[in-house]
Design a protein with these regions (language model features):
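Non-heme di-metal
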Residues: 1-165
Length: 165
């Protein structure tokens, strides 16, 4: 099947309400995962995992506040194309069991994958969401997740490639 205009019309649609619900769950599971993981990781990266839990809590709070806004009820019913990144993003709601003593490299690899999935999803949503507070939120989160991913990549390189793991 060629990927022309016909293919684009076959893509399933979703509402911004559904997007908001999935994103809220994504951030909640990330927060819980990192909070549970923090005492199990090495001291070398514990601060990173604790920061990730705090950041995910902030993102969760932002989504919950958006969901409560009366002025967004109509906007939340807007249909948009489901982003290509949606499946990968949704899959991240299911978190792995990294055991009681996960190694730093495994933790950082997982965190990088999650941040990358979030960055792609929020960027795609930014491009498809009408101007307004929800679009502004997706723009903010796309930038935040990009920043987190870059910071994690630098730390990963420092720890893994300097013999820290």
């Amino acid at each position: 099947m060629t990927r022309g205009h016909g293919y684009d019309r076959l893509k399933p649609l979703t509402t911004l309400q559904e997007v908001l619900e999935v994103a809220t769950e994504f951030e909640r599971t990330a927060r819980d995962f990192y909070a549970d993981l923090a005492p199990k990781v090495s001291k070398q990266i514990r601060y990173v995992v604790e920061e990730l839990a705090e950041e995910e809590q902030q993102h969760f709070d932002l989504f919950k506040e958006m969901a409560k806004r009366q002025d967004l009820e109509r906007v939340l019913q807007t249909e948009i194309e489901r982003p290509v990144s949606d499946r990968k993003f949704s899959d991240c709601i299911h978190v792995p069991d990294l055991g009681d003593k996960p190694d730093d490299q495994t933790v950082l690899q997982y965190a990088l994958m999650r941040e990358h999935a979030a960055m792609e999803q929020y960027q795609a949503l930014l491009n498809d969401t009408p101007a307004g507070p929800l679009r502004d939120l997706f723009e903010f989160l796309a930038n935040e997740e990009t920043k987190h991913k870059n910071e994690l990549e630098a730390l990963y390189y420092e720890i893994v490639h300097s013999g820290g793991v």
